[in-house]
Amino acid sequence: MVQQETRLRVADNTGAKEILCIRVLGGSRVRYGRVGDVIVASVKEATPGGAVKKGEVVRAVIVRTAKEYGRPDGSHIRFDDNAAVIIGKDNNPRGTRIFGPVARELRERAFMKIISLAPEVL
């Protein structure tokens, strides 16, 4: 579960290392973000010479959450960290590589480019 002020690790090569969630998109009453939700975030830590700079406001999609969640088949899955991938206005990733596993739920949310770049889909 991701909410306002949650810090997430960035799982791509845009140059950002850590982002802070400003808002979970999807309506005025949405409090928590789950895997596949789009958030607005601020870059808190970045590498020099990257595509995004510290302080920049970006859109990102959540790809991993530390809080376990159930799937329709009855199984549960959780990850070691909260992570996101920075995306553009067209919902395509701004980076060219994805690091670490991503959740299968991204396929249902039509983030096929992230699925194809990811080394592992769980």
From Swiss-Prot:
InterPro entries: Ribosomal_uL14, Ribosomal_uL14_bac-type, Ribosomal_uL14_CS, Ribosomal_uL14_sf. Pfam families: Ribosomal_L14 (PF00238). GO terms for molecular function: large ribosomal subunit rRNA binding; structural constituent of ribosome. Keywords: Ribonucleoprotein, Ribosomal protein, RNA-binding, rRNA-binding. GO terms for cellular component: cytosolic large ribosomal subunit. GO terms for biological process: translation. Gene3D superfamilies: Ribosomal protein L14 (2.40.150.20). NCBIfam families: rplN_bact (TIGR01067). Binds to 23S rRNA. Forms part of two intersubunit bridges in the 70S ribosome. Part of the 50S ribosomal subunit. Forms a cluster with proteins L3 and L19. In the 70S ribosome, L14 and L19 interact and together make contacts with the 16S rRNA in bridges B5 and B8. Belongs to the universal ribosomal protein uL14 family. This is Large ribosomal subunit protein uL14. It comes from Roseiflexus sp. (strain RS-1).
